Each structure stands twice: as structure tokens, then as C-alpha cells.
């Protein structure tokens, strides 16, 4: 089934200049970038976006990291895009991620783990609408 998912290339990816490397993994998996932009999240935006984690002990550090520099937000489209992208990302902890995944090959730590991807269809829709209006998403 064709679906969409949100991808965020985190500040560590932008700072290290590996945006193109990460996008290569995404496209090699058969996913199409149908919307993309670079932005710098404010503290309030990061807190709202990651509100589901507000009560978790890592929340303050997550917000601090996600606001530490620019990010690249993308809408990806493809067959089973959510599951495919989660496979390409690899496990949250790069030490546990399979070789050949974005996190295994590029992430420096569990905190600076390169990418965010929606975990289910409802969250994908919510997360996409957080960053993009429908007129900003293009069919390819």
C-alpha cells in the first residue's frame, strides 16, 4: 500500500554534512522525497512535536538536541513507507542497529542518532501536518 511518512534528519546530520548520504539510503530503499525543507525548531515546537515523550527522563535532552541546530524535515512516499523507512533507519540505539542502516552506519550515539521516522500511520499523518500543508507535498 502506498503511504507517506515523516522523516527528520537531525542536527547531527546537518552539522556533519551528511545530508546527501542519508538521502541516498532513503532513495535506495525505494522511497521518494515528496516534500522537504530545512528549518530550526524552537523550544516550543520541539516540545509540542515530542509531547508524547514529555514525562520521559530523556525529554529535556531531546528538546535541547533537536533545537541545537537546523534539521531537514521530509515527507517520504512509497509502498509501506512507514515500515520501510523504519527498517532503513535501524534501531534507536546505533549499537543495536543492523549494518547497512542509517543509524548503524552514521549515528554517533543513542542521542545523536541521525533520524526520526513516524512509527505508525496515525502519527505519520499528525507529524506531516505539523510541518507541511497539503499544497507543499508533491506527487512524484
Swiss-Prot record:
Transmembrane segments: none annotated. It is found in: Cytoplasm. Its cofactor is Mg(2+). Its EC number is 2.7.4.6. Its main location: cytoplasm. InterPro entries: NDK-like_dom (IPR034907), NDK-like_dom_sf (IPR036850), Nucleoside_diP_kinase (IPR001564). It is an enzyme of class 2 (transferase). GO terms for biological process: CTP biosynthetic process; GTP biosynthetic process; UTP biosynthetic process. Pfam families: NDK. GO terms for cellular component: cytoplasm. ATP binds at residues 10, 58, 86, 92, 103, 113. Keywords: ATP-binding, Cytoplasm, Kinase, Magnesium, Metal-binding, Nucleotide metabolism, Nucleotide-binding, Phosphoprotein, Transferase. It catalyses: a 2'-deoxyribonucleoside 5'-diphosphate + ATP = a 2'-deoxyribonucleoside 5'-triphosphate + ADP; a ribonucleoside 5'-diphosphate + ATP = a ribonucleoside 5'-triphosphate + ADP. It comes from the Bacteria. Homotetramer. This is Nucleoside diphosphate kinase. It comes from Anaplasma phagocytophilum (strain HZ).
